[in-house]
C-alpha cells in the first residue's frame, strides 16, 4: 500500500471432483402413504466437477478504518455423467455445465483498540444458468438454476494473543437464494 495504490492480493483456487457427486442420486419417499416428502438415497460429498476461481482483493487503510473490496470469477468445467436422473429405475446420461459464478464484495473494518475490530460488508455471488445436454441432443438450460446469493455481514474480531484470534459473525441474507441468517464463531490460529 502506498499513497496512490491500495494493497492488492491475487488468489487462485482449484476445486477437484472428489467425493460423491450430486448427479444421479435417486430420490425416494420414506413413507409410501405420504408422497410430500422425498429423501435422497445417499448424500453428495462433492460437486462432481472441476472448477477454477481467480480473484482480487483490495485493502486500503485510513487508520483506524480499513476499507476492502473483492471480486472473483469461478469457471466450472463441463463434465459428462453416466446418470443425472433422480428418478428410481431411470438412467439419464448427460453432459452438465454448471453456471459460472461472479462474486463481488465490499466493506469496512473499524479498529476499536489494538485487539478488537468490528466489520460490516456486503457480498453477492451471481451464478449463471446450468446447462445439460443428452448424448446427441441439444443443450438445454435448467430452469431456475440462475442464482443471486447476497448477504449483509457483521463481524467482531478479538486477538487473544499473537497466535489465536476469535472471529464472531452474523450474515443476513439479502436475496431469496441466500440463507436467511448465518451465525458463526471461528478460532483461527496463526503459526
Regions found by a protein language model. Name each.
Residues 2-6, 48, 61, 98, ...:
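Solvent-exposed loop and beta-edge segments used for protein-protein assembly and interaction
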